[in-house]
Amino acid sequence: MAAHAAHAASLLKSLAHPARLRVLCRLVEGEAPVPELQAVTGLSASALSQHLAVLRNLDVVATRRQAQTLHYRLLEGPALGVLQALHAAYCAPQR
């Protein structure tokens, strides 16, 4: 149980960055190319690349290359449910 709690805390700490949350909020809606993620976040290409590397290392996102463009998507896993709940609470259009 302690190991699971430590892993969960590490994951949540890594997700707890506003720029990463903006990326993930967009990816909950479906796959997106890097230029779109850059537009959504307002980050430079370099900064976005660093944030995406953190998410790849956590096995939260995966990539697919189409010509010269990388597309990102969320992976199934423990983080997905958390991200879907956050999206519903904070990112989804208000009704």
Where do the model's predicted regions map?
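Amphipathic alpha-helical dimerization/coiled-coil segments
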Residues: 1-7, 79-95
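N-terminal helix-turn-helix DNA-binding core of bacterial DNA-binding proteins
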Residues: 2, 6-46, 66-78
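Alpha-helical residues within the helix-turn-helix
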Residues: 39, 50, 56-57
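Short alpha-helical linear motifs
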Residues: 48-51, 90
